[in-house]
Amino acid sequence: MNTQLNLPHPAIMGILNVTPDSFSDGGKYNDLDKALLHCEEMLQQGADLIDIGGCSTRPNNPIATEEEELERVIPVLKAIKRHYPNALVSIDTFRKNVAKACVEEGAENINDISGGLFDPGMLPYIGENHIPYVLMHCVGTPETMHQYSLDGDIHQTVLEFFQRQCDVLESYGHHDIILDPGIGFG
């Protein structure tokens, strides 16, 4: 892929969840027309990227299958690329196969809430293909993350996590990485 996000200023990422069970919008954008309208509104309001999520990571919620996630995300991605060809699209997924399918359909960025921990194929895929990547700090899974407490120097713990994961990506010569501290997740 070898695409690089050129963000000369702080960027705004508009969130478009296409799940029936999202903790932030409760399935308001499951309909393709509603999703496109919301995308248009976010772009008009200054969003630099549209982040499509098809798998809710709400605690104590069943995780969608890979097939369900693809069925939710791919049609919306294709429609956005058709209606707003200049829009930059990010895909919120922790699955390598979903990331790969979406990049093949034109997504420019992957936003991974697991920081590469849930799918061992994610970081190698991202690194080998130099795909812009949001690396989020995460402890546990959506079911268990709120059971953990970080003892000691929280800043150091988070920095060490980022360093480990970035080292993997950088071993492939990949440096287009955005760090997300995972507030509320990690």
Please give the residue ranges for each predicted region.
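Glycine-rich beta-to-alpha transition loops that act as phosphate-gripper elements at the mouths
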Residues: 16-17, 89-97, 113-116, 182
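Conserved anion-binding
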Residues: 20-22, 57-60, 99, 105, ...
